[in-house]
Amino acid sequence: MGKPGKKFLESKKKVNRDLKYGVLEALQTAIESSYAKFDETVDVAVRLGVDPRHADQMVRGTCVLPHGTGKDVRVLVFAKGEKEAEAKEAGADFVGNDDLVEKIQGGWLDFDKAIATPDMMGTVGKMGRILGPRGLMPNAKTGTVTFDVAKAVQELKAGKIDFRVERAGILHAPMGKVSFGAEKLLDNISAFFETVQRLKPSAAKGTYMKSIAVSTTMGPGVKIDPTLVKDIVK
């Protein structure tokens, strides 16, 4: 691993590593410390007081960010008949069934999210080794296996994210772009925190949100005081 670049070291000086910021202040600081020439993504990392090795402490869910992620999400839908037409009308980028399966098996993967109607999962499930490792497999738990394809497409286009706690007990999720500004990012991160809080497992003991940090794609981490999250969560 190479040495940190000059711009990164300069951006680190704008962050007090010994301080845990309020949520809005942390977002403002992360924005101020961004330096890339492109519109960086603002990410949040939350260390939870859970042990995801135990099924009753798994935290997994979805959240529609009020202002979206700032990314143009390419949505693919596996469907037949009238559900194909419904998906196209809702704004899906790619819609089909066996033709799409054949295309994907041939190596094509130019989409970001996939939805499937339940009757298509017998076919789609056979592509688990292709779609699974890339996080593209439709899943009922995240609302992407459904007959209500219009709603699913609209939510993904509007900025619906899905997240899952990692083995170390950490959640990572994108909250939007630096260009959003701190206030819009605050709306997004508030919605995310509300969802995470609602998903707290009954088996989780002690402090739930143990540590939180936000960062831009290229910038340093900015710590948030977890005790202040309650001030923005409804």
Curated annotation (Swiss-Prot):
The lineage of its organism: Bacteria, Pseudomonadati, Thermodesulfobacteriota, Desulfobacteria, Desulfobacterales. One of its GO terms (molecular function) is rRNA binding. InterPro entries: Ribosom_uL1_bac-type, Ribosomal_uL1, Ribosomal_uL1-like, Ribosomal_uL1/biogenesis, Ribosomal_uL1_3-a/b-sand, Ribosomal_uL1_CS. The gene is rplA. Belongs to the universal ribosomal protein uL1 family. Keywords: Repressor, Ribonucleoprotein, Ribosomal protein, RNA-binding, rRNA-binding, Translation regulation, tRNA-binding. One of its GO terms (biological process) is translation. Binds directly to 23S rRNA. The L1 stalk is quite mobile in the ribosome, and is involved in E site tRNA release. Part of the 50S ribosomal subunit. It comes from the Bacteria. One of its GO terms (cellular component) is large ribosomal subunit. This is Large ribosomal subunit protein uL1.
